[in-house]
Amino acid sequence: MPLYEHVFLARQDLAQTQVDGLAATATSIIEEKSGKVVKTEIWGLRNLAYRIQKNRKAYYIMLEIDAPADAIQELERQMALNEDVIRYMTVRVDAHEQGPSAMMRRGDRDRSNRSDRRRDRDAA
């Protein structure tokens, strides 16, 4: 089966449990169509480059999917109907990344850089 990465943005006013529920709903849609979600990453609440439907921030969720094309079509149809989802994009990939995605690695790097700067500042 083809491999996909599906990223969607959820409204900023949702609770974390609702965001987790959106990811679970997407997973169940894929599994109903005989596909599987290999990995789910919730990148958290992030600033948007521009306002989307009056939202300045959004929760980012990424799914790595191994599923047939009709499962992806149904997932995208459901995303378009869901009012909590403000944007989504699905991309076909040749292979899934091993380990955390680039966004998750960037967050770890940013945290370590901040702690290094703080340590240098305190030492001075």
UniProtKB/Swiss-Prot annotation:
MF (Gene Ontology): small ribosomal subunit rRNA binding; structural constituent of ribosome
InterPro entries named among the record's database cross-references: Ribosomal_bS6, Ribosomal_bS6_sf, Ribosomal_S6_plastid/chlpt, Transl_elong_EF1B/ribsomal_bS6
An example Gene Ontology biological process: translation
Region (Disordered): 97-124
Compositional bias of kind Basic and acidic residues: 105-124
GO-annotated cellular components: cytosolic small ribosomal subunit
The entry's keywords: Ribonucleoprotein, Ribosomal protein, RNA-binding, rRNA-binding
UniProt keyword annotation of GTP-binding present: no
Keyword Ribosomal protein: yes
Described function: Binds together with bS18 to 16S ribosomal RNA.
UniProt similarity note: Belongs to the bacterial ribosomal protein bS6 family.
HAMAP family assigned to the protein according to its UniProt record, in alphabetical order: Ribosomal_bS6 (MF_00360)
Protein name: Small ribosomal subunit protein bS6
Lineage summary: Bacteria, Pseudomonadati, Pseudomonadota, Alphaproteobacteria, Sphingomonadales
Gene name of the record: rpsF
